[in-house]
Structures are given as C-alpha cells and as structure tokens.
From Swiss-Prot:
It comes from Xenopus laevis. Gene3D superfamilies: Transferase(Phosphotransferase) domain 1. Residues 336-357, 392-405 have a biased composition (Basic and acidic residues). This is Hormonally up-regulated neu tumor-associated kinase homolog B. Keywords: ATP-binding, Kinase, Nucleotide-binding, Serine/threonine-protein kinase, Transferase. It catalyses: L-seryl-[protein] + ATP = O-phospho-L-seryl-[protein] + ADP + H(+); L-threonyl-[protein] + ATP = O-phospho-L-threonyl-[protein] + ADP + H(+). InterPro entries: Kinase-like_dom_sf, Prot_kinase_dom, Ser/Thr_kinase_AS. The keyword Chaperone does not apply. In the egg, expressed predominantly in the animal hemisphere. This pattern of expression persists throughout the cleavage and blastula stages. At the gastrula stage, expression is restricted to the ectoderm. In later-stage embryos, expressed over the entire embryonic surface including the open neural plate at stage 15 and the neural tube at stage 22. In tadpoles, strongly expressed in the neural tube, motor neurons, brain regions and sensory organs (otic vesicle and eye). Also expressed in the perisomitic mesoderm, brachial arches and embryonic epidermis of tadpoles. Residues 374-390, 518-532, 556-566 have a biased composition (Polar residues). It is an enzyme of class 2 (transferase).
Length: 626
C-alpha cells in the first residue's frame, strides 16, 4: 500500500510505501523484492526516477518514504482523456527512455515497465517507480537469471513469455507497449479469453490491434520498431533514443549522462548550513549522507528543505496580482523591495513630501472651522485634510502613529508590531505575522511546572547521551491491523486513505487523527540501533517510562515546534533504516546500551522527613520580645 504522508519537521508531503512484515516473512519473494528495491533506489539517481528518502521499520511493517508526485498516476490521466495527444506522448516516452537508458548504463533492467508505474510530478514530468522486479546482476552480487518469467504479461516481451534467455531489450518492448497505450488508450495485443499461448502467438505474428488514423507515419514507424518480436532486430535503448520521431520539435538540452551521486559543489549550502546551525545536525554527517545518497532521516530533511526552498523561490518570481487579486501582504512586499534600494529612496522622498503638506494643512487657524454654515461644504464633499466634525479629527489624530509607521515604511527597518502579535496594515486590517523564511522553525517556549522540570532532567540526560539522529516510531490503535493504523514515525504522519496516484484537491487531504502518543516509550539503545516497541496499555505510566513524544512530557512541550527537524527530537529507530547495502534485514541479537552518567537524584544523599519535635530551639534569647 502506498499512502500520502506528512513530514512533521519540514511540513512537506511525502509518499509512504507500507509492507506488512507478516506477508514478507511468509513470502520470500516479497522480502527479496523489498531488499532489492531499497538498494537499487539508493544506487540510482535521475530526475525521471523517484527519490528514496528514508527507510523505516516498526514491529509489524516496513516503510519506504519517497518523494511525492502530486500529478498522480499516468493511468488516470489516460483514463480521463481516453488517449493522449501525440506531442504529449512524445514527451513522456522520451523521458521514460532517458530513465531506462540511465538504468541500463548502471546494469539494471527494470522488467516491469507499465503505465501504472509511471507517475507525474508537479511539473508534469515522468517519474518511474517500483524496482521490486528489477535485475541488477553484477552490482549487488545476486540476481534472478535472465530467464525468470516476471512482470505483467500484457507488457512482457515475447522472449520473456517463452522463458527464453533475454536481456535489457525486454524494457524496449515494454516502452513500445506504453507508447501504444498512450496514443490509443488500449493495449496492442489482447486475446479473449486470456491465454498466454495465444498472446505469445499474436506477438510473434505481429498481429497488433488496429491503429487510429490520426497517428502520424513517423510515430507508427517508431512504434513498430519498438514492438519488434525478434530481439536481434529490436533496437537497444540508445538506438531507440536516437529515433527521429522522438527528437522532432525537441528544444531541450542534448543528451548527457546524469551522475548517480551529488557532487560537493552541487550541494545547497544554505540548506546544509541551516541543518547544521539551526537543526543541530553535524556538518560532516550531513555531507557524507548526501554524497552517498544513503536513505535516512538526514537525507529526507535535506531533500525536503531543498525542495521547499525551490518552491519558495519560484513563488517569489510570480506576479503579485493575479486576476486583480493581491495574494501577498505588505510584509511580503517589504521583503521584496529590499532588493531594490533606488525604488525605496523614491518612495521615501514622496512620503516625506506628503507629510509636509499634511502638516501645513493642520497649521490652518481653527477660525475657519467656526465660519457660518452657508460657507461650509457638505460633509460628503469635505476634503480629507479639512474635516468639519471633531470626531474625525480625533480619529485622524489617533491614527497618526499608523500613518507614520506605514507612510514611510522602510524595508531596512523593523515593522511596528502591536501587542496582540499582529502588525498594522495600510488597509486598517490586522495581518498575522509570518516568517519570511519558511525553513526556519519558530521556537515557542512554554513555562512548565517545577514537577515537570525534574522529570525533564532525567529525560534530557538520556536524550543527550544517545543523541539519535533519526526519527521516532508509530503507535498503533488496532493491533489486529497494524498496517491500517501504523505510522512509520512521529516525524511522518499518514494522511488519508491509500493513494491511488490520482490528483486530488488540497482540501480533500486531511490529517487522520490516528495517533496515540501516550503509549510509546523510548528504548535505551545504541544511537545506531533502536527498535520500535509498544508498551502495554494496561501498565500505569510513571515519570521514568513517560514517552518524550507524549503531550504530557515536559521535554516535548518545551521545544514542540522549535526542534522538530533536529536530531535531538529523535527517540528511536528501527534496525532497517540504518542499513548498508546487503544489511537491510540482518538480524541483530544484542542491543548495546551506553553507560551514561548517573542521574543527579541517584548521587544525592537520601532525604528524611523531619517531625515537628525533631529540631530543638533555644527560646531563652527570645524571652521578652513576644
């Protein structure tokens, strides 16, 4: 199941693939595919392949956290439009071939290319998913032989259905089936009733379903070359990319290899600096994780913050007014005009001139106000500078500070803020103050009671000793169906029902309140290994067993929003996330507990309760003073 989730620390949405442990243990095929998918996606990096962010493990499930593709599944788009236009299908097929060519160069054969595994991002670009059936011989040290019958029969090449030896060209055939489906909305080879033998015979005989007349001859020629039943005559992925139809009206950059690892000079230094200085991550650890593309919470925070920064910069370049509606308040305008000092100087000089004119108008003697009514103008025709009633004069005097604060508003000075936490607006409204940088968490401090501070000492010492740099575990509501109710981590929250990869309105995505934080308890484990556990609900809660993620925990209340993305907010982590290549499901029998310094309470001498007669007082000195 794939669900839409929310990363709490950054506020960005992610896609979470949930795998049930019970099914994985019963079926070794599921376990093998899970291990293979996680390892391949950490080795491969391409703009048309989904980015794996984090891998989590709970008591009952595994979780693969990936980037979210808000455009939905390409299947739903074809279903809505019946078929795609030729220029749109050309764009998608070219991006798919680029992704597959990158895989083949790395020694990976996907073997399951179908419309259902093609997603669309926010820019309407293809994103390839699901590497569970991929073959990666020579990379991971193990692979299925290139004779295994796998994948969807409708997209499988003839040599694969015949259980013959095959190679990377099976992906070229699958691309041809996807191209036919995009242009027509149907599959090229269908049989009724379904039979593998009859389907194979249709493929070998080139008995393709009839093509519509609107398809160009160049597209038909490209399609027939991809659907060549003889693998020796079928083009390889490089030859398919050089097809004339795919390069017609293509104005993009020439084909170039895409590195599987981010180079040091390509890192977003602002995001790395924010993570190391504001969120508490070690600078060298952040660099090593990003350069190695190792799926963990640090990598997830980096990519999510980097995407959030890119979206913010794109929105800054958009026009201020769309459809005669201004979507940006004055605080945003003041930030924008910091980039242009000359325009600010011009506005400043004009505002000073207006102020001088207003002061000259106020210096007019009040005798003009006492003139006869016949010489007065009507109230509706009175200029704004000369009001005939005393009430508007008081209002004008009371709003003088507002005019001074906004009449010469300087983007290089602080904005005047009211006591209620809002700032004054030129439109006489109150606009809530928003941070100009959406990546900087706002620190909120709450005063806790003295009793909660004593508990916080014990909890804080253990947190500083372990210093986990990953995330916390879920708590289940219904133990019978853990997949439906589990959330892989308190840094990730599951939103809504399982994803169908169809574009949905933002108002339909609601947070499902399925979390009960009071039942979780952190483990005293090593910083590199901490399993997710579930406490017995019948056991009474105590200060020692109180979870830091509980709403009643003082350590959670103090920095509930300031340190959400920091490693100090982390409580526990499964064995699965800290895997290296080939170590994802390795059993670990021992849990090493660090020997930390004893709490302050254990080193203090025991306190004894004193009775009223225990202490003796000499009252001789007090005689005569009562």
């Amino acid at each position: 199941k794939v669900r839409e989730g929310l990363h709490v620390g950054t506020g960005e949405k992610v896609a979470v693939k949930v795998i049930d442990k019970k099914k994985a243990k019963k079926d070794t095929y599921v376990t093998k595919n899970l291990r293979r998918e996680g390892q391949i996606q950490q080795m491969i990096r391409h703009p048309n392949i989904t980015q794996l962010l984090d891998i989590l493990e709970t008591e009952n499930s595994y979780y693969l956290v990936m980037e979210l593709c808000p455009g939905g599944n390409l299947m739903h788009k074809i279903y809505e439009k019946k078929r795609l236009e030729e220029h749109e299908a050309r764009k998608y097929i070219r991006q798919l071939i680029l992704a597959v060519e990158h895989l083949h160069r790395a020694g990976v054969v996907h073997r399951d290319l179908k419309i259902e595994n093609l997603l669309l991002d926010e820019n309407n670009n293809i994103k390839l998913i699901d590497f569970g059936l991929s073959n990666c011989a020579g990379i991971l040290g193990y692979s299925d032989p290139f004779s295994t019958q796998c994948g969807s029969p409708a997209y499988a090449a003839p040599e694969l259905l015949a259980r013959k030896k095959y190679g990377p060209k099976v992906d070229v055939w699958s691309i041809g089936v996807n191209m036919y489906a995009m242009l027509t909305g149907t599959l090229p080879f269908t049989v009724e009733p379904f039979s593998l033998r009859a389907l194979y015979q249709k493929m070998v005989d080139k008995d393709m379903n009839p093509l519509p007349t609107h398809i160009s001859p160049a597209a038909i020629s490209c399609l027939r070359s991809l659907l060549e039943p003889d693998p020796l005559k079928r083009p390889n992925i490089q030859q398919a990319l050089a097809n004339r139809w795919l390069n017609d009206n293509y104005h993009g950059k020439g084909h170039h290899t895409f590195p599987n690892r981010i180079h040091l000079e390509d890192l977003s230094q602002s995001v790395v600096l924010h993570m190391s200085e504001k969120l508490g991550y070690k600078h060298s650890d952040v660099i090593n994780v990003i350069l190695s593309n190792r799926a963990c919470h640090t990598l997830a925070v980096y990519f999510l913050l980097n995407w959030k920064l890119e979206h913010y910069l794109v929105n800054m370049r958009k026009p201020d007014i769309n459809d005669n509606v201004c979507h940006k308040n004055q605080f945003h305008q003041s930030e924008k005009y910091k980039m242009n000092k000359n325009s600010y100087e011009e506005r400043r000089s004009k505002d000073l001139e207006k102020r001088g004119e207003q002061q000259q108008q106020r210096a007019i003697p009040r005798k003009l106000e006492k003139c006869s009514p016949s010489h007065r103008q009507s109230t509706c025709l009175t200029p704004q500078g000369h009001s005939s009633s005393k009430g508007p004069i008081k209002e004008r005097r009371s709003s003088k500070s507002e005019r001074e604060s906004f009449g010469g508003l300087s983007p290089f000075h602080e904005v005047r803020i009211t006591k209620t936490g809002c700032m004054n607006s030129c439109s006489l409204e109150y606009l809530e103050i928003q941070s100009p940088d959406p990546r900087t968490p706002k620190i909120m401090r709450r005063q806790d009671s003295h009793s909660q501070e004593t508990v916080n000492v014990n909890m804080g010492s253990r947190i500083r000793e372990t210093h986990l740099n990953v995330v916390r575990s879920f708590e289940s509501v219904n133990r019978e169906d853990q997949i439906e109710s589990l959330s892989p981590n308190h840094q990730y929250r599951v939103l809504g029902s399982p994803m169908s990869f169809s574009p949905r309105h933002s108002s339909e995505r609601t947070l499902s309140p399925i979390f009960h934080f009071d039942n979780t308890s952190p483990l005293k484990g090593h910083s590199n290994q901490a399993s997710f556990t579930y406490d017995d609900k019948s056991s009474p809660s105590s200060p020692e067993s109180m979870s830091p993620t509980s709403p009643h925990s003082p350590s959670c209340n103090n920095n509930i929003s300031g340190n959400l993305g920091s490693p100090n907010c982390v409580r526990s982590r499964g064995r699965f996330p800290m895997m290296g290549i080939g170590q994802m499901l390795r059993k670990r029998n021992q849990v090493v507990s660090p020997k930390g310094e004893k709490p302050l309470e254990t080193r203090m001498p025991p306190l004894h309760q004193m009775s009223p007669g225990y202490a003796s007082f000499n009252s001789s000195d007090m005689n005569g003073f009562c």
